[in-house]
Amino acid sequence: MYIGELASLTGATPKAIRHYEKLGLLPVAKRKGNYRIYEEIDVQSVKMIRLAQAVGFSLSELYDLSALKYKNNRFPVEVAQQLIQKKNQQIIEQKKALNRLQEDLKQLEDEIIQTYITHKIPA
């Protein structure tokens, strides 16, 4: 299939697909003249890349996973699970950091109210 059909099947743009190929997330496509030719495995790869990006993975985080998939001609489920667990831990840490920030904002608000109301300092 040509790049336009791959784009249509995956929701990715041809530009994004060429970018994935340039980064090594997709193997260099076979050619028929000047046209890139893709296979069904590429459809699944682009779908996986787009879904992974949607849940917070960067393209660089997906490189090893994609490389293993094409090298072994099978999806490395164990590696994917490790990446997902690592991303989940990062999200937990981000949530903790956001909660601390929210607490700090509340403390700042309380201090401002206390200072300006108690001491009747003009704003």
Where are these regions (language model features)?
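The alpha-helix within a helix-turn-helix
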Residues: A7, E21
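Short, hydrophobic-biased segments on the C-terminal half of alpha helices
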Residues: I17-R18, I49
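Short glycine/proline-centered loop/turn elements that form peptide/ligand docking sites
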Residues: L6, T13-A16
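Residue-level "edge-of-site" marker
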Residues: Y20, G33-N34, L65
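Beta-hairpin "wing" of winged helix-turn-helix
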Residues: L26-G33
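Arg/Lys-rich, alpha-helical DNA-contact motif
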Residues: Y2-E5, P27, E40-A123
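Minor-groove-contacting beta-hairpin "wing" of winged helix-turn-helix DNA-binding domains
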Residues: N34-E40
